[in-house]
Amino acid sequence: MKYIIVTGGVMSGLGKGITAASIGRILKNRGYRVTAVKIDPYLNIDAGTMNPAQHGEVFVLGDGSEVDLDLGNYERFLDIELSGPHNITTGKVYRSVIEKERRGDYLGDTVQIIPHITDEIKCRIEQAATEGDENGAAEICLVEVGGTVGDIESMPFLEAVRQMRGELPEDEMVLIHVTLIPEDTMGDMKTKPTQHSVKALREAGLYADMIVGRSEHPIGLHTKRKIASFCDVAAQAVVSATTVPDIYQVPVELEKEGLADAITTHLHLDRREALEEWYNVVAREYTSRITVAIVSKYGIEDVYLSIKEALKHAGRALATEVKIVWLDAERYEPCQLADVDGILIPGGFGIRGIEGKIRAIQYAREHNIPFLGLCLGFQLAVVEFARHVLGWKDACSEEIGDGRHVIAILPEQEGVDDLGGTMRLGNYPVTVKAGTIAEQLYRRSTITERHRHRYEVNPEEISALEEAGLVFSGLNGPRMEICELPGHPFFFATQFHPEFRSRPTRPAPAFLGFVSACRKNKKTP
């Protein structure tokens, strides 16, 4: 197993996760089997209970793990399926060590950060790295150490990496440090922040083999040589990673900088020619443009990162640029929906913004605007239909109020008090009905999709909803998973989250259908 450790310095938010995913992609382009591990140095067990406004999207893996959004980037860039062990948190590590101490596994030892915590970290990295899938075990494992070098929270993880480096042969680990190269008012690139960041890395007992400099403009040879001189790396090991308009362009830029060659040389991997698949995806040109309104609770785009990317995947496959208009569910005006080509209601929880989302669904249904609802968007589509087609004015979800509960809590969720990891999570099979839009999109009778919810369509109300014209075209046993409206340009909603399985090379069918319908019903120039 070869390890690529990715650390970050100077500041957070540099795009370290995208850089790590892109490194994995350029190696996969050369035919290597690559997996990835994200280390999050927070005390939470996982991302499931974290405020998305602070932390961004909670990404759900196939095994039901609720993880950091960077794992979504890994899955999209590498086109792989990861599992919970690939997200290591301080909370998981400490809980495991404390449980072992309580069982007596340490035989009376004084339990300390070194060696017990660091041993647990190393064990978890190695277990995740060697976990295989249908394609076999990986050859290369990317390990992104979250946070910034110098943070107190990251120190045990950096120490574990230091120990691993000493235990492994030199050609089995490479450390890539991602740092910021700012410019002064005269446009000159400043290397001092990078020098200090590398110094902090050395203080942790680690040294960088390669440096990726994040900058607004390409890093010139003079600056690269200066960084190389002060940071003890070769000039060709200093790589420029400029800001690009499309994140899927980053692997192409890193390949041009020679990073793949530098990594394979350091790790003594055989040289292989890069495959063209990724470059063909990136190079596709747009022939049309649509505008999609996302009516949401949060005004932070990272909360809906996978939806943004899934729209981009579908748009690229259909040569259509997708412009997103973000509308606050509590404040938007109906006139703002008049000129969009499609309306999307994402998942979410709680009562805030619910009525605004329902009004947007009603507008889409009555004005024949393509509509896609996801998770909560699916549930609210049922509520809207019950209110305005069946005339049940008090129709609502059990989650949000009293009235006629067309959306009810799942039986297994009754009496559940703990919030973390207790929802209906991960992959479940969905049976697709013949002769429906769902069948046209998926072209299969059974599909597998990822879930994250506690509520479902009330079984007692299904017959009345179907008799009024709502079609439930996807089922999981007694549970309704997909609904659609015949005769509408595109009115489609899913209880599951199709965005979590969308890939640049394999867009999610629900998003393909939505973007295609938006193109056909295009209003915007």
Swiss-Prot record:
Activity: how regulated: Allosterically activated by GTP, when glutamine is the substrate; GTP has no effect on the reaction when ammonia is the substrate. The allosteric effector GTP functions by stabilizing the protein conformation that binds the tetrahedral intermediate(s) formed during glutamine hydrolysis. Inhibited by the product CTP, via allosteric rather than competitive inhibition.
Residues forming the Glutamine amidotransferase type-1 domain are 292-524
The family database entries (InterPro entries) matched by this protein are listed as:
Class_I_gatase-like, CTP_synthase, CTP_synthase_N, GATASE, GATase1_CTP_Synthase, P-loop_NTPase
Enzyme Commission numbers on file? 6.3.4.2
Please give a single GO biological process term from the UniProt record.
'de novo' CTP biosynthetic process
- Region Amidoligase domain, residue ranges: 1-269
* MF-aspect GO terms: ATP binding; CTP synthase activity; glutaminase activity; identical protein binding; metal ion binding
- Residues binding L-glutamine are G348, L376, G377, F378, Q379, E399, R454
Annotated active site residues, numbered on this chain, are C375, H497, E499
Report residues binding CTP.
S12, D151, I152, E153, K190, T191, K192, P193, T194, Q195, K226
Q: Which Pfam families match?
A: CTP_synth_N, GATase
Q: Provide this UniProt record's keywords sorted from A to Z.
A: ATP-binding, Glutamine amidotransferase, Ligase, Magnesium, Metal-binding, Nucleotide-binding, Pyrimidine biosynthesis
Q: Which reaction does it catalyse?
A: UTP + L-glutamine + ATP + H2O = CTP + L-glutamate + ADP + phosphate + 2 H(+); L-glutamine + H2O = L-glutamate + NH4(+); UTP + NH4(+) + ATP = CTP + ADP + phosphate + 2 H(+)
> Which parts of the sequence bind ATP?
G13, L14, G15, K16, G17, I18, D70
Q: What class of enzyme is it?
A: ligase
Give the similarity note: Belongs to the CTP synthase family.
Q: What is this protein called?
A: CTP synthase
The record lists the organism as: Methanosphaerula palustris (strain ATCC BAA-1556 / DSM 19958 / E1-9c)
- Lineage summary: Archaea, Methanobacteriati, Methanobacteriota, Stenosarchaea group, Methanomicrobia
